Every structure is written in structure tokens, then in C-alpha cells.
């Protein structure tokens, strides 16, 4: 690789963006996330050949939230033919809030993409139809991808989200009214909230997602995770729809496929080179990590990396 990386570079980047802490807000609409310390800040890199770099709170676990939507899509791709998936969910950016009902009704219950709430719920509905134990299967997949056996769900976060699930339930019932949701709504919601409540660190996320930087293969696994074409498709979806309605702004500033979550995490992919994970719980108005985006911007400028 034509770049030099060490932990000191990442430490310097965190020092540059740390003054942003205090300018965002943690996700208060999920009570279990509202108590997270906003000053946390971490970054980690895993390269396609297995090198690891980290700085800050890179080994502290947090709720990955919507980052899990990429993982549920990966599992679905393993169990369904391509045409069946994309009949039920689209591939286009929404341009609307991630939990919007208005657009969903106008488009007759077909979500714009699998990374907004409606699309992720359809994906979870599909998994319910093919897996006897969807939550356990997700844990098995994530533990294998990461190479860490004790990754689990945060039961408190999952319960908190289920207790405040009116809007997501409305999304699911609306899709059911259009014939695009086939299983018991509360059961699928429980699976969805558990996926969001996966607890992982920046380093664990970087290892987990490195297969997307290497045409679907991970250095520590014997079998491909997805095909090269599927890896390209997932990266494309992340580039267009992974940062809620701010995908364009993120492409302008950072220039990498990425997926964020309201827990403050972001995973970004440099194709053929590395996966990057950042964490800072304070969010911008779109629900993306404020300092996390700034750290990724600093990193891509330092490395001279962009897919554009």
C-alpha cells in the first residue's frame, strides 16, 4: 500500500476533532442511549491484509444501531435470490428522514432502500421467513466476521427501543397494508431492535466490515462473505444511502461508502484497502456522528483517499 499509517496519525486526528465535542447531541429519543457519555471518541482501521490501527476509545463497545442494517442485508443476500430482495425494497436514496411514513405511503409500501427504517424492517421480515432463530443467527454471523466470540445484544437498549416503537410499528403495519410485510409485526420488531442493540467497538466493527474492502472476502475467513458483485452493490448503497439524508454532504466531505448509526458510530470503506470505524455519540441534526464525520474527513485528506 502506498501510504504509511500508525496509531500516532489517528491520535492526531482525534486531537483535531475533539473541540467539536459539545456541539452535538446524543440520541435522546432512545432513553437507553441518552445516558451515554458524549465525550467518548474513538477510531480504528483494519486493512485487507489484517493490519490494525486504533486511537482513543477504539476498544469500548457501544450500540451500533443502524450500522446493523448492512449486516442484516448481508445475511438476507445469503438466503434470497437478488430479484426477490429488490422487488420488496429499492436501491435509491430517500432524501427523507430515516423513519418517514409519508414517502412510504406515496410509494405503496416499497421502501426506497434497505438502510432506512422501513427498508431494514422489510429485510428483517424476509429473514423471519428463512431463519428459525434470526437473532441467534445474526450473533453467529457477526461473531464469525469479527473473530470475537462474546459479542452480544444490549438487552436494555433493545427493550428501551421496543417500548418506544410506535413509529416503527406504524411503518411495519403500513407496509403490511400494502402486502409488503408478511410476518408478525411485534416479532419482527423485536429482531430489528436486537440487531440495532448489538454492542461492538470501533476495532470490532472495522474487522467485521473489512470484507467490503476486499471484494467480499475477509483475511481471517476461509469462505467469501458475499460475492464481489454483492460487495460492490453494498458499497454503492452505502455511498448513496448510508448517511441518512446527508449522503451528498458526506460524499462531498469524505468521499467513501459509509453507514452510520444514532449510537454515534460510522463504518467507512476504502475499497481494496481498509475498513474504518469511528465513534462519537454526539450527533448532528441528521443523526450522524458530528465528530465522527470530521475525523473521517481528516483521515481521507491525510491519506488522499476517495472513491470519487
UniProtKB/Swiss-Prot annotation:
Catalytic EC class: hydrolase
GO function term, MF aspect, one: glutaminase activity
Sites where the protein binds substrate: 66, 117, 161, 168, 192, 244, 262
Keywords: Hydrolase
Source organism, top-level taxon: Bacteria
EC number per UniProt: 3.5.1.2
Gene Ontology BP terms: glutamate biosynthetic process; glutamine catabolic process
Catalysed reaction, written as an equation: L-glutamine + H2O = L-glutamate + NH4(+)
Signal sequence extent: none
Subunit structure: Homotetramer.
HAMAP family membership: Glutaminase
Family: Belongs to the glutaminase family.
Protein name: Glutaminase
Record organism: Salmonella dublin (strain CT_02021853)
Amino acid at each position: 500500500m502506498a501510504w504509511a499509517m500508525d496509531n500516532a496519525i489517528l491520535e492526531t486526528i482525534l486531537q483535531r476533532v475533539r473541540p467539536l465535542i459539545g456541539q452535538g447531541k446524543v440520541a435522546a429519543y432512545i432513553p437507553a442511549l441518552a445516558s451515554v457519555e458524549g465525550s467518548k471518541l474513538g477510531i480504528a482501521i483494519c486493512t485487507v491484509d489484517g493490519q490494525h490501527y486504533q486511537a482513543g476509545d477504539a476498544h469500548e463497545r457501544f450500540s451500533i444501531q443502524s450500522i446493523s442494517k448492512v449486516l442484516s442485508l448481508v445475511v438476507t443476500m445469503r438466503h434470497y435470490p437478488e430479484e426477490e430482495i429488490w422487488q420488496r425494497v429499492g436501491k435509491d436514496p430517500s432524501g427523507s428522514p430515516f423513519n418517514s411514513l409519508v414517502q412510504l405511503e406515496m410509494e405503496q409500501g416499497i421502501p426506497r432502500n434497505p438502510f432506512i427504517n422501513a427498508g431494514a424492517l422489510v429485510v428483517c421480515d424476509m429473514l423471519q421467513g428463512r431463519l428459525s432463530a434470526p437473532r441467534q443467527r445474526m450473533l453467529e454471523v457477526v461473531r464469525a466476521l469479527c473473530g470475537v466470540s462474546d459479542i452480544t445484544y444490549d438487552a436494555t437498549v433493545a427493550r428501551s427501543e421496543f417500548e418506544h416503537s410506535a413509529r416503527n410499528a406504524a411503518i411495519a403495519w403500513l407496509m403490511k397494508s400494502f402486502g409488503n410485510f408478511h410476518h408478525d409485526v411485534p416479532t419482527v420488531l423485536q429482531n430489528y431492535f436486537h440487531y440495532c442493540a448489538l454492542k461492538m467497538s470501533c476495532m470490532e466493527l472495522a474487522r467485521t466490515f473489512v470484507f467490503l474492502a476486499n471484494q467480499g472476502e475477509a483475511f481471517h475467513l476461509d469462505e467469501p462473505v458475499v460475492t464481489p458483485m454483492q460487495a460492490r452493490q453494498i458499497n454503492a448503497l452505502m455511498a448513496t444511502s448510508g448517511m441518512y439524508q446527508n449522503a451528498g454532504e458526506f460524499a462531498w466531505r469524505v468521499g467513501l461508502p459509509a453507514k452510520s448509526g444514532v449510537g454515534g458510530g460510522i463504518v467507512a470503506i476504502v475499497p481494496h484497502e481498509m475498513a474504518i470505524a469511528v465513534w462519537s455519540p454526539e450527533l448532528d441534526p441528521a443523526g450522524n456522528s458530528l465528530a465522527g464525520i470530521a475525523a473521517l474527513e481528516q483521515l481521507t485528506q491525510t491519506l488522499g483517499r476517495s472513491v470519487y
